[in-house]
Amino acid sequence: MKRRPHKIVSVVLLVILIAGMGMACRIQSLESRNKRWAENTETAGKILTESGKKEAQKQTDGTENDAAAQNAKRVFGDEPAELYARSAVLMDADSGRVLFGKDADVVRPMASTTKIMTCILALEYLREHPDQTIEVSDQAASQPKVHLGMQKGEVFYIKDLLYSLMLESHNDSAVAVAEGIAGSVEEFAKEMNAKAAEIGCKNTHFITPNGLDAEDEGGVHSTTAEDLAKIMRYCIMTSGEKETFLEVTRTKEYQFQDADRKRTFSCHNHNAFLDMMDGALSGKTGFTAEAGYCYVGSLRRDERTFIVALLACGWPDNKGYKWKDTRRLMEYGLEHYHYREVYRNTVPDKLLVVDAFDPGIPYQTSEKISLRVKNSEESKKILLREEEEIRMEIKTVKCKKAPVKKGEKAGTVSYYLADEKIAENVVVTGRAVEKRTWEKCMKIVTAKFLTLESLVWYVKYV
């Protein structure tokens, strides 16, 4: 049989043209449907959002004040019956959640508990200046008791003075450290306040590095029990110098000399809590006439870490009140709060991508792709009471237009305890999707019809 090349080419081109027109109609139809679907999805999302806003507003209007709401969340009927401290907090150091609070947001003087901030800033400074020394100024040498007894003109290594600061609570050492790092007490106070803001403290104002009662144009030297617990959490859990901080504050005895080796000094740790309970981790005492007795301390047991902060916990002769309150709160936490595994790696619904291009299915204008939770663990351990439950809320977009990148944000998975958000993960796309174009579609169609197999079939059977 005689072959007719021109006939073959003509027929193939005709088939391509018909197929292309058919696919174009199919694409236009699907595109219109996807556009309507996307518009409906967007509208539904807006309605849902407005509804959520109205509900949130109702809840806000129904709350008389933040303090009352905070207290209401934490009433279980078995809280510590009586505390001597006027302000107190029990915090989960892992999450930063306040497990119990008594006037936790009332602003009060903090006395020498201030020195945990002075210490952690000094340790972070020493990371770059490990052998920094300081010449004692007249201001440092004239600080009232409790003091090391340094003299003007003496030179000390800052790292040695941190033991004087934290074990004996020496006021002159605090001023010397501040001047050695920032040049003056005033400049160091700025660094203290900046760090407090960075940590998330909302009601803390530092004026002195040693915690002596003071007042300036910004207010009095003060904090809250919750803010003080946040600062301790930073010192033992978050700071890059947390291990060194624990090493310093747990040291029982320390001896050092001035840089010229003319005098020798000995320091003894006065934090009685370290020997009071198994797992006692760190802490700092404080007292001034305005502040009363204060304390902030931490305990770690069975992988749980608790922080207690106490302000205005008695005045002379009630020095032991702070230890009773600390023990009572720590025992309360140990008895009632335990880690529970909460499933986190929840896979949300798939995401519809319109204007999508799949080389394997060129006539398809949309496709569904999987979503995943970014950097998610299999499960998350959260410190909870037996009766507490975690509520999960998934918010994802229903539709996106191509192109879509792999790992592109598509929503969030939030975890709530009562009405408080305690964790949030980002939901991202599982893979990339190309944008559909006419050129890409026609290229695929042409390639399919111009294969050698199709030509052979046509010649053989037509």
Report the location of each language-model feature:
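Structural motif marking the loop-to-transmembrane transition
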Residues: 5-9, 158, 438
